[in-house]
Amino acid sequence: MASLSWWNPAPATAAMAACSPTPTSCKTSNSLALPRSVFVSKQEELMKQAKSLLVKTQQQSKKKKNNSTNSRRTTSIQCLSQEQKWTHEGSITESLPNGMFRVKLDNADVVLGYISGKIRKNFIRLLPGDRVKIEVSRYDSSKGRIIYRLRGGREG
């Protein structure tokens, strides 16, 4: 390895003296010399406080998680969503693209029906002539969601 002529390190004793801490017995104008036990006890105190704060925040977050599911509130929301739908039976008259069908209800109304996720997931095939159960919103009765394919074959 080539020697570095431009690099001249300081003597080891000078570097050690510069890095070594001041002895505890000498007093300077900026700091007080305190025994090591005071620092250790303060450090232990701070660690205990930090741990207690951490435990308190963990307990509070657990309490928040438990309180976030209010059974009375969720049941009222579910009831509202169920109240806003009417269920009708009808037969599919026409197949349209993207899982949509024209459905003629038993009361002679014609509704545009789309397939629900359960029917898509279970790969249930719907063809014109099938009897289906459809869920229609009270606010827009021209569209509905096909929720069930009734057994019993097709109408001819």
From Swiss-Prot:
Q: Where is the transit peptide?
A: 1-81
The GO molecular function terms of this record are: ribosome binding; RNA binding; translation initiation factor activity
Q: Where is the composition biased (Low complexity)?
A: 67-76
Q: Where is this region: Disordered?
A: 51-79
Query: Which compartments does it reside in?
Result: Plastid, Chloroplast
Keyword Membrane applies: no
Q: Which GO terms describe its cellular component?
A: chloroplast; cytosol
Write down the InterPro entries for this protein, in alphabetical order: NA-bd_OB-fold, RNA-binding_domain_S1_IF1, S1_domain, TIF_IF1
Provide the S1-like domain boundaries.
82-151
Pfam assignment, any one: eIF-1a
Write down the Gene3D superfamilies for this protein, in alphabetical order: Nucleic acid-binding proteins (2.40.50.140)
Q: Which UniProt keywords apply?
A: Chloroplast, Initiation factor, Plastid, Protein biosynthesis, Transit peptide
The function of this protein is: One of the essential components for the initiation of protein synthesis. Stabilizes the binding of IF-2 and IF-3 on the 30S subunit to which N-formylmethionyl-tRNA(fMet) subsequently binds. Helps modulate mRNA selection, yielding the 30S pre-initiation complex (PIC). Upon addition of the 50S ribosomal subunit IF-1, IF-2 and IF-3 are released leaving the mature 70S translation initiation complex.
Return the HAMAP family for the record: IF_1 (MF_00075)
Q: How does it assemble?
A: Component of the 30S ribosomal translation pre-initiation complex which assembles on the 30S ribosome in the order IF-2 and IF-3, IF-1 and N-formylmethionyl-tRNA(fMet); mRNA recruitment can occur at any time during PIC assembly.
- Which family is it part of? Belongs to the IF-1 family.
Q: What PANTHER family does its record include?
A: TRANSLATION INITIATION FACTOR IF-1, CHLOROPLASTIC
Protein name according to UniProt: Translation initiation factor IF-1, chloroplastic
